[in-house]
Amino acid sequence: MKLLLDQGLDTKTVIQLCFKEQDKIITRLKNGEVLIDILCDGQTLKLFKILHVLAKHMSFKQALTCAERIDNSSNTISYHFFTKIAYPIFIFCFAYFMILFFSRSIIPSMMVYSNGENSFLLLDLLEILFTLLFICMVVLLVLMFMYVKVPVFKEKIIPYLLKNKIYQLYVTIQFSIMLESLLASNLTSKSCFQILSEMNYFKEVHYFGNRIYQELLEGKRLETIINTIPFDKTFLVFFKIGMKSADLVTILKVYYEQAIKSFKTIVNKLIVTMQVFSYSCVGILVLVVYQIMLLPLNMLNTI
């Protein structure tokens, strides 16, 4: 749709080319409805929710360009995290269920051949450790599901999560991406924070944006407000440099590009730690099972 608008086509022609129900849309337009309300009606995609907010403050073409930029950039971090974390979680679950299988099915049948409890004790300790970690992982997954699907829960828990440096970095990156995209659309700083305060779909960004905008309405200086917000410390440095240089857009872009690299590095370290731990436990399991499998042979040698 954006490509057609860039070619100078009128709205009616673009609607006829892009939508199956063009007649209904055109009829609703003739009845006085706003195009953006028609397009976003019943839509659940994040792009349309962003577009609906932006269209109130800029032209439809500008809003579409800005919404696409925000949507594409903000998806990068989440996609990287969830795609990278999936394999370590699989390895962890595989190791856990292997331990359960051997400790519940294989080991009891081998107990008759052994008087040594050391190997069994080690396996029991592994089972307890993995069970505790598995319960923690399930709880975290449930909390993540609630965080994504229950807006009220997300809104309540954000202030507590911001005490975590990794989450703080993640939210600050999202905020800087959106702010940079809005400033690049030639909006004033106050208008940008007003838009961010209306981004209810992005509760994290809304939390920051609404707080800043409300304090701006009270007459406080932006430089003072920024220092009171729990942003990533590096962001505060870049933001102040950008304000002094009068080129905040470029500085913000430099910041979030560096911050994304830092976030990916942290995620990769977490992934490597999980993989090493899971592989190590699988290795211990193999050694224990190997020792147990040798027990009947050892008994034959003693006869």
Tell where the protein language model's regions lie, with residue ranges.
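Juxtamembrane/interface alpha-helical elements of multi-pass membrane proteins
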Residues: M1-L29, E127-L216, V267, I271-S278
